[in-house]
Amino acid sequence: MGLVNLNPPNVAVNIAEDIRNSDTVTAANATTTTSVALAANPLRAGYSIYNAGTVTVFVRENATVAAALYKHPIPPGYLFESEFTSSRYTGIISVITASGSSNLMVSESTIAA
């Protein structure tokens, strides 16, 4: 988690309540070839990826990911959850491994219309 300013300036903020739908969970597989864990979704509220496999999976919020160019590594047995305190990311989420393959459980929640 990054730095958080606990003494922000007095600025008016317009906050709208987002109502989420229930999560959708799918099984996915990460290999040494880039694959899409989640397609772009303009209604995405958040997502999580659990690495149920035996090798580290590299994740990036982009169509391009590599074992040397990624945003988050997910070791075996770990869960990555998107940051809920920042703006929503609605684009493609890609995964890859440096070697071998890994089974993933990918969960996505969407905003109710």
Locations of the language-model features?
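Surface-exposed ligand/attachment interfaces on beta-rich extracellular proteins
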Residues: 21-42, 65, 100
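Noncatalytic modules at the cell exterior or secretory-pathway interfaces
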Residues: 45-47, 85-102
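Short, intrinsically disordered N-terminal pre-domain segments
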Residues: 1-21, 108-113
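Short, surface-exposed beta-strand/strand-loop-strand elements in extracellular ectodomains
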Residues: 50-72, 106-107
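Tight coil/turn sites that cap or link beta-strands
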Residues: 29-31, 69, 75-79
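Solvent-exposed strand-loop boundary residues in beta-sheet-rich modules
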Residues: 63-65, 99, 110-112
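Beta-sandwich interaction modules
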Residues: 74-90
